[in-house]
Curated annotation (Swiss-Prot):
Record PANTHER family: WD REPEAT-CONTAINING PROTEIN 41, WDR41-RELATED
Gene3D superfamilies found in the cross-reference section: YVTN repeat-like/Quinoprotein amine dehydrogenase
Protein name (record): WD repeat-containing protein 41
GO terms for biological process, alphabetical: autophagy; negative regulation of exocytosis; negative regulation of immune response; regulation of autophagy
Organism of this sequence: Mus musculus
Length: 460
């Protein structure tokens, strides 16, 4: 186990970022992750981490290898080989009944146009599905129906026995980029800038075969959809490459709230202008969502935004949370948020309430605090003035985990075992709660001394 010496801030990549980027010094009292364990097994970018159970996870990336790890000790348990190109999607497929004796499966899609199905307990490849016409970019499990979906240039429906139950016709050469399950035996699929709703028809006595039907195509986005996530049983959210965020009703598929930050290039641009516009577009790309019962947390370019569902407005934002694009975020207990970025950093944030004065400017830009949630609001309609004192929140940096030397692709949180991060530097880091680990080591030493009779030596 290595000891992590918490350093000061990193030097930002440019002077503009240096002024805006929030930093933290050596005093990181709310950051428990003071020890780290470096795990080495991959030979290329590690892009995916998936939780298998409370003590195991799997990693996969561009080397085509899948590795199963012990989240507590960092021990490599299994190495799964079978793909010839990079992994493009990974998902766990647990038994329908948690009491079943059958093993949990792991599904892995690859650029070699195959999907591997693995036994997580033995590492055996159960089957390699090879009938795909294009690369499968996303996998989704519908646990209730005990089936899984593969999204590529078409959408396929499969059972646990790996039978192809049904599939759609060719949808797009670019393929399905994201899938979520929504009520009514439906799924929402992001295909370019389109959101397509499909309904699954389950077998009956009259119709014994499975079927999948395209119900509706929604064209509300102006550019490619990058992120798609469920909010709750009645709503889901999508985000696009040009900063459009739409909240949808999961039952009738109508837009319930929207915010657009348009990017309109002029007809003629020189090379320098094109670079600047490209940078601007990246700054507003909605790269990832996570949600809880109260808020939507959005990674927008290099920034973080917290949108409250009840208040229908942004309650906190950190416009420059990282030096580069944020790739993954997740909400932790105790109002904490973790983000990882192309800048190689993993940062911990806390949502804190504060009293905003009337004179203090309201955050604008990506989210419009007043227009958000009012789909039919006319531009000429007067904006309601802010009350004298509005309780809002701030995102405060409470931890900066510096260990990777390249882009951090994603992370997993284990309540009992710490944080796991994967990176383009080919490494996985298991971040440990230093205080807890010290206590565990002391307890083991105490037990060892007691077993050897050295704890209470007899008097001469």
């Amino acid at each position: 186990m290595l000891r992590w010496l918490i350093g000061g801030g990193r030097e930002p990549q440019g002077l503009a970022e240096k002024a805006a980027l929030q930093t933290i010094g050596e005093d990181q009292g709310q950051n428990p992750y003071t020890e780290l364990l470096v795990l080495e097994a991959h030979r290329d970018i590690v892009r995916f981490l998936v939780r298998l159970d409370d003590f195991r996870f799997a990693s996969a990336g561009d080397d085509g290898i899948i590795v199963v790890w012990n989240a507590q000790t960092g021990e490599k348990l299994l190495e799964l080989r079978g793909h010839t190109q990079k992994i493009t999607a990974v998902i766990a497929f647990p038994p329908l009944d948690s009491c079943e004796a059958s093993s949990q499966l792991l599904l892995t899609a690859s650029a070699d146009r195959t999907v591997g199905v693995w036994d997580c307990d033995t590492g055996r490849q159960i089957q390699r599905v090879t009938c795909f016409q294009s690369t499968v970019k996303c996998l989704t499990v519908l646990q209730r129906l005990d089936i899984w979906l593969s999204g590529g240039s078409d959408l396929g429906v499969w059972n646990r026995k790996l039978d192809l139950l049904c599939k759609t016709s060719h949808l797009s050469d670019t393929g399905i980029s994201a899938l979520v399950e929504i009520p009514g035996n439906c799924v929402a699929a992001a295909v370019g800038r389109e959101l397509i709703i499909f309904r699954l028809v389950t077998p009956t006595e009259e119709l014994p075969e499975w079927d999948i039907i395209e119900v509706k195509r929604l064209l509300d986005h102006q550019d490619n959809i990058l992120s798609l996530a469920n909010i709750n049983d009645t709503g889901f959210v999508t985000g696009s490459h040009v900063g459009e965020l739409l909240i949808w009703d999961a039952l009738d598929w109508t837009v319930q709230a929207c915010e657009r930050t348009f990017w309109s290039p002029t007809a003629q641009l020189d090379a320098q202008q094109e670079i600047k516009l490209f940078q601007k577009q990246n700054d507003i790309s909605i790269n990832h969502f996570t949600c809880d019962e109260e808020n939507i947390f959005a990674a927008v370019g290099r920034g973080l935004y917290v949108y409250n569902l009840q208040l229908k407005r942004v309650i906190a934002c950190q416009k420059t949370a990282h030096d580069s694009n944020i790739l993954h975020i997740d909400k932790l207990p105790n109002r904490q948020l973790i983000s990882c970025s192309e800048d190689g950093a993993v940062r911990m944030w806390e949502v804190r309430e504060k009293q905003q004065l009337a004179a203090e400017p309201v955050p604008t830009g990506f989210f419009n605090m007043w227009g958000f949630g009012r789909v039919n609001k006319q531009a000429s309609q007067p904006v309601k003035k802010q009350e004298e004192n509005v309780t809002t929140c701030s995102l405060e940096l409470i931890g900066d985990l510096i260990g990777h030397s390249s882009s951090v692709e994603m992370f997993l949180y284990f309540e009992d075992h710490g944080l796991v991060t994967c990176s383009a530097d080919h490494l996985i880091i298991l971040w440990k709660n230093g205080e807890r680990e010290s206590g565990v080591r002391s307890l083991k030493l105490f037990q060892k001394l007691e077993e050897n009779g050295d704890l209470y030596p007899e008097s001469p």
